Amino acid sequence: MLDNTLENISKLNESDFIDSLINEARLVTIFLVSGIKLEGIITSFDTSTVTLRGSNNTQLIYKHAISTILPV
C-alpha cells in the first residue's frame, strides 16, 4: 500500500514539473535511456508520452524511453 502512495506522489510531482515547463515554454534537454540528447520545448504530455517541439520538427517521445528532463 505504501508503494502505491509513493507512486501516486511521484506521478503528481512529475505532472507538476512537466506542467510548469509547458506553462513557462521552457527550453529543455531530454536525455533518452539510449544516450540520445534532444532539445526543444515540451508542448504536451499524457500518462505515457511527451511531445517535444524542436527547431524544425515535433517528436512524440515515450516516457519509458526518457532518462532525464533538464530545463535549460
Where are these regions (language model features)?
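Short glycine-rich, low-complexity segments
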Residues: 1-39, 43, 47-72
